[in-house]
């Protein structure tokens, strides 16, 4: 997969904030894609006491959700762990993994936030703007915003609101299990993002895309045995 993105690594938090403020103006909050044949999940893990960043991508056919390709890339970790700035720590390895793909996805589901972020530029939005592809944020925990209690049955959701703005939804992806946090990444509307996340769910809390990517990213070895995942 050809990647034309130029990634800027900030040298200070102020510079990082400036980059986020500039890039958030480029986020597109409406559907800008046509046929979807492949969806991908992206997740990041760390090795060697966080000295190495390991990005994993799982590409699945859509709507059958059959795993068709996986790629992993590992790079030295160059940015510290700071909540709200994780994209600067994780995106370099993600871009390297994307470059290895032979099957380009039509939509990417990221393990993390989209616009459900203090400066409206979580990793899904940051990545989406850089590579100019539709992305969705699918997070396991809340970063910012408030919401009402979500009914316990699968498929129910409540809007996630911050400063009077709907920044995503809190979605019950599995009955009686903790919800997930879905937000626009780039080039997709919120209703469409919810729909694709729901279509990527099976019997687990996480969509199949990010569930596969999570297993790959957390693998400590260099070789991945897919038969054991």
UniProtKB/Swiss-Prot annotation:
Keyword line: Cytoplasm, DNA damage, DNA repair, Endonuclease, Hydrolase, Magnesium, Metal-binding, Nuclease
Role according to the record: DNA repair enzyme involved in the repair of deaminated bases. Selectively cleaves double-stranded DNA at the second phosphodiester bond 3' to a deoxyinosine leaving behind the intact lesion on the nicked DNA.
Entry's Gene Ontology cellular component terms: cytoplasm
Stored NCBIfam families: PRK11617.1 (NF008629)
CDD domains: Endonuclease_V
Species of origin: Rippkaea orientalis (strain PCC 8801 / RF-1) (Cyanothece sp. (strain PCC 8801))
A GO biological process held by the record: DNA repair
Intracellular or extracellular location(s): Cytoplasm
Protein name: Endonuclease V
Domain of life according to the entry: Bacteria
Family annotation (InterPro entries): Endonuclease-V (IPR007581)
Gene Ontology MF terms: deoxyribonuclease V activity; magnesium ion binding; RNA endonuclease activity, producing 5'-phosphomonoesters; single-stranded RNA binding
Enzyme kind, highest EC tier: hydrolase
EC number of this enzyme: 3.1.21.7
């Amino acid at each position: 997969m050809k990647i034309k993105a130029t990634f800027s690594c900030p040298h200070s938090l102020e510079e990082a904030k400036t980059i986020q403020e500039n890039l958030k103006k480029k986020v597109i909050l409406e559907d800008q894609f046509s046929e979807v044949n492949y969806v991908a999940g992206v997740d990041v893990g760390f090795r060697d006491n966080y000295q190495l960043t390991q990005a994993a991508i799982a590409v699945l056919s859509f709507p059958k959700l059959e795993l068709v390709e996986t790629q992993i890339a590992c790079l030295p970790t160059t940015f510290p762990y700071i909540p709200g700035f994780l994209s600067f720590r994780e995106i370099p390895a993600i871009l390297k993994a994307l470059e290895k793909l032979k099957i380009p996805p039509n939509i990417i589901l990221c393990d993390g936030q989209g616009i459900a972020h203090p400066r409206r530029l979580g990793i899904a939005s940051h990545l989406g703007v850089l590579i100019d592809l539709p992305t969705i944020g699918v997070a396991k925990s809340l970063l910012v915003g408030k919401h009402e209690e979500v009914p316990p049955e699968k498929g129910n959701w409540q809007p996630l609101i911050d400063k009077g703005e709907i920044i995503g939804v809190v979605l019950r992806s599995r009955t009686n299990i903790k919800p997930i946090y879905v937000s626009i990444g780039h080039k997709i509307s919120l209703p469409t993002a919810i729909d694709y996340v729901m279509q990527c769910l099976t019997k687990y809390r996480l969509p199949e895309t990010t569930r596969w990517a999570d297993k790959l990213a957390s693998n400590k070895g260099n070789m991945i045995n897919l038969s054991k995942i």
